[in-house]
Amino acid sequence: MKINCSTIENKYLRIKTLNIGATLFEVFYKEKKVNLILNLGSKDNYKSKNFYVGSTCGRFAGRISKSKFIIGNKKYKLNNNEGNNILHGGKKGFDRIIWKKIKHSKQKIVYKIESPHKDQGFPGNLIVKCIYQLKNNNFFIKYEYFSDKLTHVNLTNHSYWNLNLNKKNDIFNHDLKINANQYLEVNNYLIPTGKIKSVSNSINDFRKYSNIGKKIKLNFLKKVKKISKTINQSGFDLTYVINKKIDYFVASLKNRDSKIKVDVYSDLPGVQLYTSQSLKYKKKLFPYQGLCLETQFFPEAPNIKKFPSTLTKPHKLYKYFTKFIIK
């Protein structure tokens, strides 16, 4: 397995990516001279399984209960990797695959993967492109895909943001705003129940800037509940239903000390907030060191009809974008 690093940059930002998992390895903000996301240090560290650090998750980001769904009259059994459930595409999801780099210009990188029929149990031969693109102090992550059969697809990038100048500091000094009046209720295994709940009068309300550290300390740290290696309810791991707006605004994250701010925009219907309570990698990464804002469709969507559909029609091209503005 040969892992290669590629770079695009302009006068504002330098973006580094890896071909394994079409991974976002670095977002270097030149004005502050700091990388804004976590990584594993060396690119060779990505050869082993990790906490999806910067990776593209697929074929289906998030969880699907009992690792199965039905299309038409046919039931599909998927390769479970979290108890009886499947998380982020299975045991060998897109994060573990070497993607082919098909384009590399000064401000754009395009990766491509061809996922065969029944890959991790999913139907259809699926072709996916992951595009990283720079424009001034903005950078884009775009996904394009099509299949030759009816199938379910949900892609996201799993970067851990940390806007501190020193990455040894946690995210408790970060303030977050999410453009969402609602979130998905989940069970103890973080599987959506199908109920969509209001954020009003709850700890899940981020409609105005709220301090991450204060929310976690008040609501989680005194009642830590760890169910498994990947299910730790001592922080946020929740899907928000983005309010529909013309400008596609999703969320804004800012740091009180560094004064750095990241605004997120996307045409996808949800965003997964994860505060890295389970994160651990050697002596480099630790819990609450990063914050994920994973723009995506809803977990468990193949089994809940009222959720925005993730069903892809044969030979139809699907395109989605997420934009990050660094200030």
Where are these regions (language model features)?
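An exposed, glycine/acidic-rich loop-and-rim segment of catalytic or binding clefts
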Residues: M1-K327
